[in-house]
Amino acid sequence: GDMAGGFDVLKDVYKSQVYDLASYRNRLEDTPVIPERVITRPPSAELRPDQKDQDSLPDYDTLDAILTLYIDEDMGYQEIIDKGYEAELVAKTIKMVDNSEYKRLQAPIGTKVSHKAFGRERRYPLVNKWSIKG
């Protein structure tokens, strides 16, 4: 799974960037290194049969845009809504980020490529049902 291993190369990369990197890597060779079916297959956490990420998440461009505003730009709930995103989607995204904070503390080390990576640059409480939404 995503949390396996001793070094996480993609730790600090949004999902839409992973797809861009895969496509870029394939353009460097005459024969694709990453099979096209891997890139075009609907994403899934594969936690249950026929599960697709898009069943419970927005498209990755939208999700990554909200995540960028919340994580990288330090915008709050209302500020993100003011950018034109649905309140329910923003609340759900923020809740998913906040509820997964403990997982990031268990993750292996990895490369830092963003303006603000999880870890030393972004630490949030794990207890008391803390949330930035408000």
Predicted regions and their residues:
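ATP/NTP-dependent adenylation/nucleotidyl-transfer catalytic domains that generate, transfer
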Residues: G1-G134
